[in-house]
Amino acid sequence: MTMKPVIALVGRPNVGKSTLFNRLTRTRDALVADFPGLTRDRKYGDGQLGGYLYTVVDTGGIGENDDGIDVPMTSQSLQAVGEADVVLFMVDGRAGLTAADEQIASELRKLPKPTYLIVNKTDGVDADSAMSEFFALGLTEVLPIAAAHGRGVTSMIEHILEGFTDLELLPEGEHRTSKKPGEDSIRVAVLGRPNVGKSTLINRMLGEERVVVFDHAGTTRDSIEVPFERMGRAYTLIDTAGVRRRGKVFEMVEKFSVIKALQAMEAAQVVVVVIDAREGITDQDLHLLGYALDSGRALMIAVNKWDGLEADHKERVRVNLGRRLEFAPWVKIKFISALHGTGVGDLWGMVEQAWDSAFIKIGTNELTRMMEEITNGHPPPRNGRFRAKLRYAHLGGNNPPTLVLHGNRTEALPTSYKKFLENRFRELLKLEGTPIRLEFKSGTNPYEGRKNVLTDRQVHKRKRMIKRMKK
C-alpha cells in the first residue's frame, strides 16, 4: 500500500520553520518575518520530489515560557508531532545551542519515530563548525541547510524520503506542482475584527482544539487552512488574522497578516464574517463586508456572543443589522455562540446552500426562457423612439454567478431596470447567500456609420409624416 509521509517541523520560535515550509511546498503560504512567534497554529501543505508526494506541517515555536500564549502554541506543536511520520527538529546554526533546544531534544528522543536534527542558517558560516555543538543533543541524523536560500534543502528531503518504501506517486500526466490540501474542497474563509471569536468558531465547527485560542486580540497572525471531511463532503476552513482599522495597524507583521487575510478571502469560495453581538455591526465590519462583496464570494454573517444578552439589546442589534445591510439583502445572518455551540450546526447548511448557489449550472436555453418570461411581463422602458431588446442569455461564470445578456441597445437600459432583472433572476434561480452579476452585450449594427441615402419620393413622404405628427 502506498503512503504519503507526514513531516512535522518543530523547534524554537524564529529558527526558520515557516521558511523551510515554503521551500518544501513551493508556496508562500506561511507568513515569514524576522520575528519570533509568528506562526501560532499548525499549517499543512503538500509537496513532491521526483514525483513522490509528502505532506509538511508547520508549527508554532515551542516557547520557553510556561504562561501566556506559548502554552497553547506548544500544545499545537506536540499535536503535529503526534500526527507525523517524521519529525524535523530545527535549530539556529548562528545562535548556537540553547537550553530550549536541549529541552525539546530530550522530549523528541523519547519518540518512537524518525527524528532529524536540521541545522538552519548555515549560509555564510562553516557548516561543520555550526553543526558540531548540536551533536551533544544525541540525535544521530544531523543535516545542515540554509532554508532562506534553498541550500541543502533538496538533498535533505531526498535523504528523508529514502527511509520510506512504497511512497505515493504523483498521478501520471498530472502537472508536477505543489497542490495545497483542500484544493478540490469547499473553501470557507472566516473573517472578522480581532477577538470576535473566529478561532473559537472554527474549533467548534471542527470539534477539536485545532486553532490556537487565547483571550487576546491578534492571536492569529497567519491564515490557517484546515482541510477535513463532513458527511462525505470535503471542506477547507481558513482562519484569518483579525482586520483592524488602518490607523490602528502599527506592526509590520500585522500589516502582512491583514494582507494574508484579504488574500485568503480571494482564495475562498464562501466567506463567513464574524461580528461581536455585544458591539453590534461597526464601521470596520462594514469595510470587511465591502471587501467580501467586491470579491464576489458567497457571503454570510455570523453574529457571535449572542448568548447572555438582554432581549432589548438583541432587538437593537437585529434592527441595526437590517438597516445597515439594506444594500445587500441577500446576505444570510445567523446568531450564534461559538463558545457554547449554539446555532453553529446550522452554519453548515448555510455554507452548502451558498456554495451550491455560487456554482449553479444552467443551460443557455433555460436561462433564455427565464429572461423572456421576465421581459414579457415587464419589458424594458422605452428610451426616446427606441426600446432595448434582449435576445438571449447564457451563464458566463461562477462564484459569483455571472449572467451574460445579449441584445440590441442594452447600453440604454436604466440602472433601475438592471436591478429589477437581477432581483428577478435571483428569485427564479433560487440563489441564496451569493451575489449575482449581470453583463450586457449589444450586437453590432452592420449598417452603422453608413449614410442612409433616400430617394426623392422617400424624402417627400418623410416630410409629410413629420408635418402630420406636429399637428
Swiss-Prot record:
<keyword id="KW-0547">Nucleotide-binding</keyword>
<feature type="binding site">
    <location>
        <begin position="58"/>
        <end position="62"/>
    </location>
    <ligand>
        <name>GTP 1</name>
    </ligand>
</feature>
<dbReference type="GO" id="GO:0043022">
    <property type="term" value="F:ribosome binding"/>
</dbReference>
<comment type="similarity">
    <text>Belongs to the TRAFAC class TrmE-Era-EngA-EngB-Septin-like GTPase superfamily. EngA (Der) GTPase family.</text>
</comment>
<feature type="binding site">
    <location>
        <begin position="192"/>
        <end position="199"/>
    </location>
    <ligand>
        <name>GTP 2</name>
    </ligand>
</feature>
<dbReference type="InterPro" id="IPR015946">
    <property type="entry name" value="KH_dom-like_a/b"/>
</dbReference>
<keyword id="KW-0342">GTP-binding</keyword>
<dbReference type="InterPro" id="IPR006073">
    <property type="entry name" value="GTP-bd"/>
</dbReference>
<feature type="binding site">
    <location>
        <begin position="11"/>
        <end position="18"/>
    </location>
    <ligand>
        <name>GTP 1</name>
    </ligand>
</feature>
<feature type="domain" description="EngA-type G 2">
    <location>
        <begin position="186"/>
        <end position="359"/>
    </location>
</feature>
<dbReference type="Pfam" id="PF14714">
    <property type="entry name" value="KH_dom-like"/>
</dbReference>
<dbReference type="Pfam" id="PF01926">
    <property type="entry name" value="MMR_HSR1"/>
</dbReference>
<comment type="function">
    <text>GTPase that plays an essential role in the late steps of ribosome biogenesis.</text>
</comment>
<dbReference type="GO" id="GO:0005525">
    <property type="term" value="F:GTP binding"/>
</dbReference>
<dbReference type="InterPro" id="IPR027417">
    <property type="entry name" value="P-loop_NTPase"/>
</dbReference>
<feature type="binding site">
    <location>
        <begin position="239"/>
        <end position="243"/>
    </location>
    <ligand>
        <name>GTP 2</name>
    </ligand>
</feature>
<dbReference type="InterPro" id="IPR031166">
    <property type="entry name" value="G_ENGA"/>
</dbReference>
<dbReference type="InterPro" id="IPR005225">
    <property type="entry name" value="Small_GTP-bd"/>
</dbReference>
<dbReference type="InterPro" id="IPR032859">
    <property type="entry name" value="KH_dom-like"/>
</dbReference>
<feature type="binding site">
    <location>
        <begin position="304"/>
        <end position="307"/>
    </location>
    <ligand>
        <name>GTP 2</name>
    </ligand>
</feature>
<feature type="binding site">
    <location>
        <begin position="120"/>
        <end position="123"/>
    </location>
    <ligand>
        <name>GTP 1</name>
    </ligand>
</feature>
<keyword id="KW-0677">Repeat</keyword>
<feature type="domain" description="KH-like">
    <location>
        <begin position="360"/>
        <end position="444"/>
    </location>
</feature>
<comment type="subunit">
    <text>Associates with the 50S ribosomal subunit.</text>
</comment>
<feature type="domain" description="EngA-type G 1">
    <location>
        <begin position="5"/>
        <end position="168"/>
    </location>
</feature>
<dbReference type="InterPro" id="IPR016484">
    <property type="entry name" value="GTPase_Der"/>
</dbReference>
<keyword id="KW-0690">Ribosome biogenesis</keyword>
<protein>
    <recommendedName>
        <fullName>GTPase Der</fullName>
    </recommendedName>
</protein>
<dbReference type="GO" id="GO:0042254">
    <property type="term" value="P:ribosome biogenesis"/>
</dbReference>
